[in-house]
């Protein structure tokens, strides 16, 4: 269910944005890993590394040097946890691309895309992130209250807020600085 929703949203959202013409939809469409400059892919690694242990711990899964242990022997729960984390990453991926590719030239099929950096566009992209969060959270909250999955969805909100923080407060011509701020914000908090 989670995988199906994430797939639909990942395909549908760029076209909805394109229709409203508020954000450069091409910038979202090119957020596939194959087109990532390496430093744009790093935030995904950070999200995965920092998020998976937190969510697994909330489910009673613990990782030791000897392997993976579980207080609950139903390993399918752990797989559902990981699937949900991947779902969150897929939702965050387009928005993080918008943030960390500011001022970076992307070449796809010899088409040069330079993302705009005005404050107005950055504010719009931040609002877009909250729209994504509004779509994702009900699914995660539903899993919590139904007892299917106990996941710390506040961590997901925290990642959105971190991205918005880096997007609005860091100079628009410094994507590397944005990346450093994102790392610090996630690890410190």
UniProtKB/Swiss-Prot annotation:
The lineage of its organism: Archaea, Methanobacteriati, Methanobacteriota, Archaeoglobi, Archaeoglobales. One of its GO terms (cellular component) is plasma membrane. This is Uncharacterized protein AF_1268. Disulfide bonds: none annotated. Its main location: membrane. It comes from the Archaea. The chain crosses the membrane at residues 4-21, 34-56, 79-101, 122-144, 148-170. It is found in: Cell membrane. It comes from Archaeoglobus fulgidus (strain ATCC 49558 / DSM 4304 / JCM 9628 / NBRC 100126 / VC-16). Keywords: Cell membrane, Membrane, Transmembrane, Transmembrane helix. It is a multi-pass membrane protein.
């Amino acid at each position: 269910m989670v995988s199906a929703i994430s797939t639909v949203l990942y395909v549908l959202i760029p076209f909805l944005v394109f229709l409203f013409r508020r954000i450069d939809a091409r910038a979202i469409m090119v957020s596939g890993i194959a087109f990532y400059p390496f430093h744009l892919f790093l935030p995904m690694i950070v999200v995965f590394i920092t998020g998976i242990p937190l969510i697994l711990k909330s489910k009673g899964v613990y990782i030791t040097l000897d392997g993976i242990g579980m207080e609950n022997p139903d390993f399918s729960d752990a797989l559902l946890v990981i699937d949900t984390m991947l779902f969150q990453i897929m939702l965050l991926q387009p928005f993080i691309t918008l943030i960390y590719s500011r001022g970076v030239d992307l070449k796809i099929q010899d088409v040069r895309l330079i993302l705009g950096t005005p404050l107005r566009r950055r504010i719009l992209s931040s609002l877009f992130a909250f729209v994504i969060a509004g779509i994702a959270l009900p699914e995660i909250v539903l899993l919590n209250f139904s007892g299917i999955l106990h996941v710390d969805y506040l961590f997901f909100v925290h990642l959105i807020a971190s991205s918005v923080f880096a997007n609005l407060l860091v100079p628009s011509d410094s994507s590397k600085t944005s990346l450093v701020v994102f790392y610090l914000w996630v690890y410190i908090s």
